[in-house]
């Protein structure tokens, strides 16, 4: 793949040798600052503590995250042993954490200090498992043990294909699945960009980055580990800080990666303050469809942007839409980008809906519209302890994303929704993302999302929930609804026009920003009935 070290930790240790005094990790409020030399020492310390609890290559270690430096330290301590960091948000209900443990069977627990879940409040199922609180510079308490300084950076024989972490998919519905990610997941795409000399997404050695995305989310974990491998100063935390703008300015941040809801928040703050972030060079975004006006505003301040598309299962990003002359027009049309060199994509048409994959007997050439399959060097290893689901989603190295996309002649791909969310009305397939996109092009609409309304005659009708750009009285709300309806009459076929339009205060979304359409339907119904 490259002449660089074959594991994430080895690459970070290489940076520690080059810049030992440089800060590797720090909270956005200035606390928990950890130079690269101390990061390496703390990794040794906690790896020793884990080894004393019988953790070894292939063992699972539950990492209860607070998204701060200690969380990433815990991941790297696992990496030194070849153990697998099982990521769990410290704000999750104990029952959910208990379910994660039933799936992964961890041998130890590492708890970040800002987690709401502590060693005394762990689920009953974890009572017999050693729990270690991760505190920078304080040793390991009752589990203090001689550090692993006499051992190599990682266990001998570990390589790019060895597992590093598990992330549970949030999804919009269904049983949680533990996505098993290899070391290569976190550097395959950056290596491609560097080798190809492409500036779609760029990292500069030693720059300052900030990620508000959780370490339990592929975007958060991937972004911070990638920047650590480039010797960057990684700012973390701040989930409860009211101002993104303040964090970026006070820490002189050069690069950041946001979900579209946070991008909208940042734009709102910058507009209100009539200011910019002078240090900011690059803003990446992804997880759900962005509002083109927000991207246009950021680019007008001189900041380069890059939309990244992918899933936990594809190792974060597989397609990219960087700043170019007509990128805003592409975003307005629903584009999510084009594949990186070395990433293969395939659109399976409706008549290939059996899910057998691009290499199946009888599979035709990639369609212009269909379910997207991705073959990337960053793809997951599979779902932990779930071979049946793995065989359904990962076939011959190809991941079935479940997303419906359309390929245009310019080589860019445009998202239309998820195959599982397709609304079928009178036998016609309606792509939810296309309905959403049309509504968000109406002046006065901040965001919008459609949902399914059961109907005895057509099977289903389209409902639309809208968040207005400003507060409005009943008369203004009626006027906005009429404007939206008129826009659909001009822009869409009749079957895809909303039969009901509801003004709501917010669109329910997953942690990664994806619309929770079932919850949205319930919320819209409650608004209509006055519940």
Swiss-Prot record:
Residues holding ATP: 218, 308, 312, 403
Keywords: ATP-binding, Fatty acid metabolism, Ligase, Lipid metabolism, Magnesium, Metal-binding, Nucleotide-binding
GO molecular function: acid-thiol ligase activity; ATP binding; metal ion binding
Disulfide cysteine pairs (residue numbers): none
Listed EC numbers: 6.2.1.-
Annotated Mg(2+) binding sites: 169, 313
Cofactor(s) essential for the protein: Mg(2+)
UniProt cross-references to PROSITE patterns, sorted A to Z: AMP_BINDING
Deleted gene: phenotype: Deletion of the gene cluster mmaABCDE causes a significant decrease in the intracellular accumulation of zinc in Sauton's medium where metal concentrations are relatively low.
Catalytic activities: a (2E)-enoyl fatty acid + holo-[ACP] + ATP = a (2E)-enoyl-[ACP] + AMP + diphosphate; a (2E)-enoyl fatty acid + ATP + H(+) = a (2E)-2-fatty-enoyl-AMP + diphosphate; a (2E)-2-fatty-enoyl-AMP + holo-[ACP] = a (2E)-enoyl-[ACP] + AMP + H(+); (2E)-decenoate + holo-[ACP] + ATP = (2E)-decenoyl-[ACP] + AMP + diphosphate
Family as reported in the entry's similarity comment: Belongs to the ATP-dependent AMP-binding enzyme family.
Stated role: Acyl:acyl-carrier protein ligase involved in the biosynthesis of a unique class of isonitrile lipopeptides (INLPs) that seem to play a role in metal acquisition in M.marinum. Acts twice during the INLP pathway, catalyzing the activation of (2E)-2-decenoate as well as probably the corresponding (3R)-3-isocyanyl-fatty acid as acyl-adenylates (acyl-AMP), and then the acyl transfer to the dedicated acyl-carrier protein MmaB.
Official protein name in the record: Fatty acid--[acyl-carrier-protein] ligase MmaC
UniProt source species: Mycobacterium marinum (strain ATCC BAA-535 / M)
Name of the encoding gene: mmaC
């Amino acid at each position: 793949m490259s002449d660089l070290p074959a594991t994430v930790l080895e690459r970070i240790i290489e940076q520690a040798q080059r810049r030992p005094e440089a800060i590797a990790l720090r909270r956005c409020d200035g606390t928990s600052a950890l130079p690269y030399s101390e990061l390496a020492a703390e990794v040794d310390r906690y790896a020793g503590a884990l080894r004393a609890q019988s953790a070894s290559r292939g063992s699972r270690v539950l990492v209860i995250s607070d998204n701060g430096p200690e969380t990433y330290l815990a991941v790297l301590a696992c990496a030194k042993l070849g153990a697998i960091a099982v990521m769990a948000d410290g704000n999750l209900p104990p029952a959910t954490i208990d379910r994660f443990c039933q799936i992964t069977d961890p041998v130890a627990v590492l708890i970040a200090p800002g987690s709401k879940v502590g060693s005394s409040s762990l689920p009953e199922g974890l009572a017999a498992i050693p729990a270690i609180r991760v505190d920078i510079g304080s040793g390991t308490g009752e589990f203090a043990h001689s550090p692993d300084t006499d051992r190599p950076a990682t266990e001998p024989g570990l390589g790019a294909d060895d597992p590093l972490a598990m992330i549970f998919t949030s999804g919009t519905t269904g049983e949680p699945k533990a996505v098993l990610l290899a070391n290569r997941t976190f550097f395959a795409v950056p290596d491609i960009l560097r080798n190809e000399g492409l500036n779609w997404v760029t990292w500069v050695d030693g720059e300052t980055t900030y990620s508000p995305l959780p370490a339990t989310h592929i975007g958060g974990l991937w972004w911070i580990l990638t920047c650590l491998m480039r010797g960057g100063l990684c700012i973390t935390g701040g989930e409860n800080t009211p101002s993104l703008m303040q964090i970026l300015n006070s820490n002189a941040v050069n690069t950041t990666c946001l979900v579209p809801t946070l991008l909208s928040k940042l734009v709102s703050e910058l507009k209100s303050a009539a200011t910019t972030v002078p240090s900011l060079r690059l803003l990446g975004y992804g997880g759900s469809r962005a509002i083109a006006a927000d991207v246009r505003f950021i680019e007008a301040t001189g900041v380069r942007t890059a939309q990244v598309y992918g899933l936990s299962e594809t190792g974060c990003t597989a397609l990219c839409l960087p700043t170019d002359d007509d990128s805003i027009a592409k975003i307005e049309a629903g584009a999510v980008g084009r594949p990186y060199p070395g990433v293969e994509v395939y659109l399976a048409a409706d008549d290939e809906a059996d899910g057998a994959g691009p290499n199946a007997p009888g599979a035709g050439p990639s369609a212009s519209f269909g379910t997207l399959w991705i073959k990337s060097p960053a793809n997951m290893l599979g779902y932990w302890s779930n071979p049946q689901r793995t065989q359904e989603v990962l076939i011959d190295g190809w991941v079935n994303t479940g997303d419906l996309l359309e390929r245009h002649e310019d080589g860019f791909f445009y998202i239309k929704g998820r195959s599982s969310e397709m609304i079928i009305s009178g036998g016609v397939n309606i792509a939810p993302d296309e309905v959403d996109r049309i509504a968000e092009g109406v002046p006065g609409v901040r965001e919008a999302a459609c949902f399914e309304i059961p109907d005895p005659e057509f099977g289903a009708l389209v409902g639309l929930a809208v968040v207005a750009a400003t507060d409005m009285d009943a008369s203004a709300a009626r006027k906005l609804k009429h404007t939206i309806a008129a826009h659909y009459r001009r822009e869409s076929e009749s079957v895809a026009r909303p039969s009901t339009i509801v003004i709501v205060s917010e669109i329910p979304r997953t942690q990664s920003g994806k619309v929770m359409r079932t919850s949205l339907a319930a919320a819209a119904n409650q608004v209509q009935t006055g519940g």
